[in-house]
């Protein structure tokens, strides 16, 4: 739909429209290892302009990037990322945007939220201010610009079949 001009990702899937736009030169693509991508976003949210990592040294990921040696090891310089919009889902949030995440959502949601110039959050449970204990808050509402309670949170589980029964 041509709503973005550049995709920075660790994996893009098998979307035919995305593939077509990339192959036609209509969409720029930058791959990053998943941990590096997460750290770039965390750094952006923390106001850190760049950092060094060994991940990607000697691969296509390193092409065109500054390198530096520390204690005999080569590192790549990665610039932090700040997005125009961060869209995050949380388990619970209050009306001021204080959020609680559950399980694997605790990994990347908070850093992604802080790296967005605008952060929109969909919560499973929207509660009143004060209903979340301060020690239970994973992301303070200062980072949240909009919050709403979502609907129909279906938890899909894949069923893997190895052989016929």
What label would you give each PLM region?
Residues 1-165:
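Conserved alpha/beta enzyme-core scaffold
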